[in-house]
Amino acid sequence: MISENTIEERLQALRAAIALHDFHYYVQDAPVIPDAEYDALFRTLQQLEQQYPHLVTPDSPTQRVGAPPLKVFAQLTHQTPMLSLANAFSEEEVTAFDRRIREALNIDRVDYAVEPKFDGLAISLIYANGILTKGATRGDGYTGEDITLNLRTIPSIPLRLQVPFPTGQFEVRGEVVMLKTDFERLNEQQRKNGEKTFVNPRNAAAGSLRQLDSRITAMRRLTFFAYGIGAYHEDQPIFSTHSEILAYLATQQFLVARQSSTVMGANGLLAYYREMNAVRLSLPYEIDGVVYKVNDLAQQEKLGYVSRAPRFAIAHKFPAQEVSTELLAIEIQVGRTGALTPVARLAPVFVGGVTVTNATLHNEDEVQRKQIMIGDTVIVRRAGDVIPEVVAVIVERRPTHAQAFVMPDHCPVCGSKAVRLPDEAVTRCTGGLYCPAQRKQAILHFASRRAIDIDGLGEKLVDQLIDRELVHTPADLYRLDIDTLAGLERMAGKSARNLVTAIEDSKKTTLPRFIYALGIRHVGEATAKALASHTGDLDRLMDMNAEQLQQIPDIGPIVAQSIADFFSEAHNREVIEQLLSCGLQWEKPSHIAQPSSRTNLAVPGKTFVLTGTLPTMTRDQAKNRIEQQGGKVTGSVSSATSYVVAGSDPGSKYARAIELGIPVLDEDQLLSLLRDTSSSE
């Protein structure tokens, strides 16, 4: 069972990540992750906070709208918050939204206003007695940036309202976008000028609107679409529905999306969604979904708001754009941790504003699940409009020459054996000490403080050593000299001497540190200590097979196989020999826990958990007796546990054993079980 501390740490990590991405998206207008990935983070946070409401904090992203604005522009406080909308990604979520509305209003059918969801920047316009006086970005929803001068340059924003205009203050809200044709024209001009082009219309609109020099904004073609109103005086026009607001804004010469409409009930919402998704590409501007709002303003008022969004509205997001193309080949990329990832090489295709030639296939299971073959016509989606992904095969178009994909059993980079451990989806290169693709990670880990501990060997220095081909494996570190190091960037003679001294000092280490430094997958510090304690000798450890390794306490089949695979790879053994020949050494431990070599063990391979206080034995004594008879003792109860040995005052482990139906022994029963074999010797 996951502890509450673990949940709290997960919540803190999610909040920190979302806050950082909010800053990139809302403030810098330079998102670093796809929208779909952000949505997944936010939904995960929402779900966890719903499960653990007592862990919700006031500063959680779910309790606010966005991120604080920059201090570059003057700040403008919104009289009424510019809230974001909750998102729906499926028809089921839309149906659930409609059901909540009907139940809250106690009516059978709801009249909805529906409109496109522009992919631009939300803007507030303030008119005083019919004259545009202020304009601001949404910012964090409560305070935005005053960009009045820039907004005044946009032709589709009226500087003066039509007579009769509302008296006092009147706020219009909408979205600034760049039309597709204007975006293409701007990028063409950028290319001619030798300047950086924009990735998509939204980025172009953001970059244009947030210029400190409004003359630059004036040269960019931006368009404003109105979709609502904010604060206004009581003596201003009285509206009863949202559609009436849009109609009024149109009379004031604001652009209002022609696709705005009204529908009845969930069926009407879904029909509108399908209609807009079908015409999405033909629209003059980018949209990433549609917006549903309860049309009746009195009903909106009754439904109210949550801290982040109105209850009466929701955004129904479109799936990422999808197109078909030919899969020309499947190549393997090797990551810095040794993961082998199949990558589709595609006939070039334009998806979501960019030309795509590669797409991730994730892993071998995904290729098989989707029945992907080389030569297939595949559907490519830009997941989150950023990461290209092969989502399906058009089997009807499969050519006769299509070839099945076979995951390689050797690393394409270094030739080492590639293995896939049980219960893992990823195939990995076992040449961790040798593989060029893993070189940087292997050297940094080897030299880290808890491993061999080479003081002064940081990431930037390792980059230089690798880039200049001075170091290929950790063993090469011990061949570096002062003159070579002094020739590197930011490495004077003194720094070089200090590093050579640190490298020399690192030769005297311990066996647990050395084992940990090798970077064997699943082998942390505790496991390295256990391996050293129970073998006492590196050669012995390197020659053990997976079955023998499992006789060591807390070494399960997956970890055992990972260790065996690592040491069976000749490249790794060669690097280890080089390290030893360079002078790395350690003292042998004074006590070595030897697994019994007897063949007639009482409990070979059985797993025990101890809980409570035993009458005549300490836990260590009980553990030693169990291990002498081929068993192993672990610290937690699971379905893999063979027996739980309970003394007086047993803890939660006892209750867990009862829950799982695992046999519970007292001390006498344990001794009897262990004597069954010893008495027959």
Swiss-Prot record:
Binding site for Zn(2+): C411, C414, C429, C435
Tree of life domain: Bacteria
Family matches, as SMART domains: BRCT, HhH1, LIGANc
Positions annotated to bind NAD(+): D35, A36, E37, Y38, D39, S84, L85, E115, R138, E175, K293, K317
EC number(s) on file: 6.5.1.2
An example Gene Ontology molecular-function term: metal ion binding
Reaction(s) catalysed by this chain's protein: NAD(+) + (deoxyribonucleotide)n-3'-hydroxyl + 5'-phospho-(deoxyribonucleotide)m = (deoxyribonucleotide)n+m + AMP + beta-nicotinamide D-nucleotide
Annotated GO biological process: DNA repair; DNA replication
GO cellular component, one term: cytosol
Disulfide bonds: none
Cofactors: Mg(2+); Mn(2+)
Alphabetized InterPro entries for the sequence: BRCT_dom (IPR001357), BRCT_dom_sf (IPR036420), DisA/LigA_HHH (IPR041663), DNA_ligase (IPR001679), DNA_ligase_AS (IPR018239), DNA_ligase_CS (IPR033136), DNAligase_adenylation (IPR013839), DNAligase_N (IPR013840)
Domain BRCT, first and last residues per copy: 598-681
Gene3D superfamilies linked to this entry: 5' to 3' exonuclease, C-terminal subdomain, 6.20.10.30, BRCT domain, DNA ligase/mRNA capping enzyme, Helix hairpin bin, Nucleic acid-binding proteins
One Pfam family of this chain: DNA_ligase_aden
Active site: K117 (n6-amp-lysine intermediate)
Keywords linked to the UniProt accession: DNA damage, DNA repair, DNA replication, Ligase, Magnesium, Manganese, Metal-binding, NAD, Zinc
Known function: DNA ligase that catalyzes the formation of phosphodiester linkages between 5'-phosphoryl and 3'-hydroxyl groups in double-stranded DNA using NAD as a coenzyme and as the energy source for the reaction. It is essential for DNA replication and repair of damaged DNA.
Family to which this protein belongs: Belongs to the NAD-dependent DNA ligase family. LigA subfamily.
Protein name: DNA ligase
